[in-house]
């Protein structure tokens, strides 16, 4: 849920005064003839542009972030921030951005048309028409005219009639139109706030569902003009040159939303709203900034909620307070970090393992010393309490939470009522106020007893022993073995245990692991369990996986998988530590579970749960093909698992080696992602990581070969390849047919031959609509330009049919890389 747009809706007012500077023009007096074009260029942050006659505004491609694509925009060109006031919102990509080399052309039949470097159309202003020319006006409006005179007012399209998140003077909002916020300052996806002139003439400001941003999925209403009288409804929201904003009604009466502004008398101010329609006056001279509430739409306290639905100004577990000019400020509590560091208004995640109520964990959880409270004075979370008590003092209130595994926080009323409210995670509508009469106490794991997963520089300073202990303390969900498990031990293993006990650090780790149902094994124990490593299950880039049998309490045996790292070198050491650290922190039904590990001398092994149905590769590449329904369910489940790694862990995790051989199936054919040996933790305060090339041929994203920053989009690429394998039941690289699957799949899609991908698969042939959707999603995922790939949340939503899937462009328009016969192998390798 929820991120508040850094810029809810911009309302920009300009006083047009004569300018004293003449700027170079790409077009003559704002007139753009048919055939003119602009190209997005990596060589400069702002590509070539067309300027309005005064030079106040520019039109062209803008690159917002170094590693992202471009957006077609209109912006202020005479201020240093180059503030964008319009952007092509309906770009036919999942990210809303277009790649380097894309071109916008003014055409006779489509008006403004964006095409990628291969000529694939990404967006157009008109579905049809006969455009004679375009004109870029001094008030920031780009207008397309029909054949004939401009004076005839035969306007086919204009940016003013298709607003995005900004309203300029002389720009009006018609019935049924709306302004929509951006997700963040640097994200051009639709945000969750909308200012709309409804069909009944009522002007309303809404908060929308953050996931869908749909106008039909309204959470909160902040304002309405009540101009919905059936006899005299509002017909237009007018914004004039005097700074006056009003709803024009049918009988020409005005409902004034904002009076004329006296500040319009100063030299050419720009009004830019941020936060909840709060204005900032930025003169062209940029010497001063003046703020205030715009439109009268602001409440006295925008942090104060009016209903329990949605999460208002700040995300879950985030605290809202009012700063200067009544602007909402959001801040994560101590021991919490932003889910998206670029969005201060978003959700906050705990940096510790939260208490659970699983029966097997109650012994540990019952120790109240494991937890403590952080205190947030004059802070309240008004919704979501599940129990309340009257006449409790503060200590009794906190004690009731410590002994309750459901309780995440308590709110204690400091007024005369002395009331205590218990809350569960996530906490919503957090508000801090100097006049608040409540204190919040959030329950966190006690640092003095157990280290917790951390982010930032502190994590880098922890040595391996401390990391291991903290990981073990974070894995109470892995309950395959009870601390009372008794293992058969040979005399050799007993002696090894005695020797091991002399190592204080190893003893500490073992004790910690046993307390939390995770085991530190000796080499002898695992050698006995695997019958001296005789039954091989599979091989990876750095190790071999063996089948093993461990005796548990009662004399029964449990089957396990033991991964033995077969070479001891720096990379192996790094892989071993990464795998234990990463898997020990996560628990999700589509991720493999860790049981324990061995780190004895030069022997490094990891013990997993055993999944009886083997790998997805064995499941897919067999005859007869698995059922189409099973394959669809597996595709969605794997996407959810990767989404969890990328967005829902306390630290973002990049797997780096997604492929069918690393997907295991349980007895119900539920997929679980395994082999995190190549995983890289991407700390929450970073945007990318540079690393050695890792992965498996056929699944490796192009940026690995270009010494480019590695982001979570490498997993998206690998998933796209695997999704094609799931659809076709063919390997990414087929040596027998000498076929590269991604090339063949795109050719079939481009030529309308999708049935070739599912030949002899009657079940899939009867569901070609889903087949086509999955193939299009896969092609989006394998785009060579990583900025064109969707994130895994978008992928999951597309798989589930929640969001539309547009036709993808050629995924490899620039690629000169070819697989040699020698390299046509799907064996796991480490690419250097």
UniProtKB/Swiss-Prot annotation:
Residues 25-461 are extracellular. Residues 1-24 form the signal peptide. The chain crosses the membrane at residues 462-482. The active site is at 657 (proton acceptor). Residues 299-349 form the EGF-like domain. Residues 37-157 form the Bulb-type lectin domain. One of its GO terms (molecular function) is ubiquitin protein ligase binding. Disulfide bonds join 303-320, 314-330, 332-348, 397-420, 401-407. Residues 531-803 form the Protein kinase domain. It comes from the Eukaryota. It is a single-pass type I membrane protein. This is G-type lectin S-receptor-like serine/threonine-protein kinase RLK1. The lineage of its organism: Eukaryota, Viridiplantae, Streptophyta, Embryophyta, Tracheophyta. The gene is RLK1.
């Amino acid at each position: 849920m929820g991120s508040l747009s850094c810029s809810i809706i911009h309302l920009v007012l300009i006083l047009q005064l004569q300018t004293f500077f003449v700027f170079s023009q790409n077009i003559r007096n704002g007139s753009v003839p048919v055939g003119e074009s602009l190209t997005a260029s990596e060589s400069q942050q702002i590509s070539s542009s067309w300027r309005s006659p005064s030079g106040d505004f520019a039109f062209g491609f803008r690159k917002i972030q170094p590693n992202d694509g471009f957006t077609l925009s209109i912006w202020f060109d005479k201020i240093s921030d180059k503030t964008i006031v319009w952007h092509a919102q309906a770009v036919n990509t999942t990210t809303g951005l277009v790649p380097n080399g894309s071109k916008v052309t003014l055409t006779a039949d489509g008006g403004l048309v964006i095409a990628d470097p291969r000529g694939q159309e990404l967006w157009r202003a008109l579905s049809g028409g006969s455009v004679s020319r375009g004109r870029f006006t001094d008030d920031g409006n780009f207008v397309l005219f029909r054949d004939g005179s401009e004076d005839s007012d035969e306007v086919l399209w204009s940016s003013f009639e298709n607003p995005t998140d900004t309203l300029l003077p002389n720009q009006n909002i018609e019935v049924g139109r709306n302004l929509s916020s951006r997700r963040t300052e640097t994200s051009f996806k639709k945000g969750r706030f909308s200012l709309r002139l409804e069909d009944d003439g009522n002007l309303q400001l809404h908060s929308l569902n953050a996931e869908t941003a749909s106008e039909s999925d309204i959470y909160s209403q902040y304002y309405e003009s009540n101009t919905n009288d059936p006899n005299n409804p509002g017909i237009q929201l007018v914004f004039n040159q005097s700074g006056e904003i009003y709803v024009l009604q049918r009988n020409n009466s005005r409902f004034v939303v904002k009076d004329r502004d006296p500040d319009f008398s100063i030299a050419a101010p720009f009004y830019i709203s941020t936060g909840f329609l709060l204005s900032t006056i930025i003169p062209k001279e940029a010497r001063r900034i003046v703020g205030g509430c715009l439109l009268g739409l602001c409440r006295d306290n925008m942090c104060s909620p009016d209903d329990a639905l949605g999460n208002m100004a700040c995300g879950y577990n985030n605290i809202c307070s009012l700063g200067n000019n009544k602007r909402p400020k959001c801040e994560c509590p101590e021991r919490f970090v932003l889910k998206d560091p670029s969005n201060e208004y978003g959700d906050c995640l705990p940096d510790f393992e939260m208490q659970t109520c699983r029966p097997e964990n109650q012994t540990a959880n019952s120790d109240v010393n494991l937890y403590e409270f952080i205190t947030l004075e004059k802070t309240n979370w008004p919704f979501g309490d599940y129990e309340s008590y009257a006449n409790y003092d503060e200590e009794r209130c906190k004690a009731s939470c410590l002994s309750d595994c459901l309780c995440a926080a308590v709110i204690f009323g400091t007024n005369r009522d002395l009331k205590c409210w218990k809350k569960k995670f996530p906490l919503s509508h957090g508000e801090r106020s100097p006049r608040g009469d409540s204190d919040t106490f959030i329950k966190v794991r006690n640092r003095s007893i157990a280290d917790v997963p951390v982010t930032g520089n502190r994590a880098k300073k922890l040595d391996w022993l401390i990391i291991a202990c903290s990981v073990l303390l974070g894995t109470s969900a892995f309950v395959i073995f009870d601390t009372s498990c008794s293992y058969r031990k040979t005399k050799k293993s007993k002696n090894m245990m005695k020797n091991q006990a002399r190592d204080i650090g190893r003893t500490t780790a073992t004790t910690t692991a046993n307390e939390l149902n995770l085991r530190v094994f000796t080499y002898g124990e695992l050698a006995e369990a695997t019958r001296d490593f005789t039954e091989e299950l599979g091989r990876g880039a750095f190790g071999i996986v063996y089948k093993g049998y461990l005796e548990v309490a009662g004399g029964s045996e449990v089957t396990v998988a033991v991964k033995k790292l077969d070479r001891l070198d720096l990379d192996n050491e790094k892989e071993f530590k990464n795998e234990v650290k990463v898997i020990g922190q996560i628990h999700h039904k589509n991720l493999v579970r860790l049981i324990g590990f061995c780190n004895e001398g030069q022997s490094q092994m990891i013990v997993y749960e055993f999944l009886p149905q083997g790998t997805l590769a064995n499941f897919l590449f067999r005859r007869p093909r698995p059922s189409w329904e099973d394959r669809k369910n597996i595709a969605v489940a794997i996407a959810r698992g990767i989404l969890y790694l990328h967005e829902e862990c306390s630290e973002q995790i990049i797997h780096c080696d997604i492929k069918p051989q690393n997907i295991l199936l349980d007895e119900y054919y539920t997929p679980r992602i395994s082999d995190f040996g190549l995983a890289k933790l991407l700390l929450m305060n970073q945007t990318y990581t540079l690393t050695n090339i890792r992965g498996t041929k056929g699944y490796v994203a192009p940026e690995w070969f270009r010494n480019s920053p590695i982001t979570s989009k490498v997993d998206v690429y690998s998933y796209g390849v695997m999704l094609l394998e799931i659809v076709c039941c063919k390997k990414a690289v087929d040596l027998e047919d000498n076929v590269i699957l991604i090339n063949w799949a795109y050719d079939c899609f481009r030529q309308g031959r999708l049935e070739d991908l599912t030949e002899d698969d009657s079940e899939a042939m009867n569901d070609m609509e889903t087949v086509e959707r999955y193939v299009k999603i896969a092609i989006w995922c394998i785009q060579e330009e990583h900025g064109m790939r969707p994130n895994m949340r978008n992928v999951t939503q597309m798989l589930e049919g929640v969001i539309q899937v547009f036709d993808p462009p050629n995924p490899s328009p620039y690629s000169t890389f070819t697989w040699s016969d020698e390299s046509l192998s799907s064996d796991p390798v480490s690419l250097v």
